[in-house]
């Protein structure tokens, strides 16, 4: 959806607060300063609101602010992968169960996957503050996303997957660290 850039007029119409972060690039096109974390957050909020019907998305300032288009692409790749074993038809609906390891405060994969395809998500994280933020986003938007805490960092699946659980897909980002060390 965003390969040709962003429709800032449309996004500002939906989220007027984004306008304060818009600038003109050297060729006169409207954009934002992608080095400005506040601008990226506001763009993410506008994209989620306009394209995915997520009316509240606010994460703590010390948390990763994921670029929405890349996360959307990942969900579409997974949909294409699921279609390979479903007569080339992308499966939709809550009968498709997805497990997001490291869902984070932004809970972005479950938000987009549920909005685009109606899939049922379970998000897992080790950080209680991230899960609290994710829970607030889910509650405010009236979304049924199951959130679970992984208490032992070394265990990725053990302790969060219950004996009755079945998942069609598991997704994650690489681990994020506070520094390069």
Region locations from a protein language model:
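S-adenosylmethionine
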Residues: 126-128, 132-181
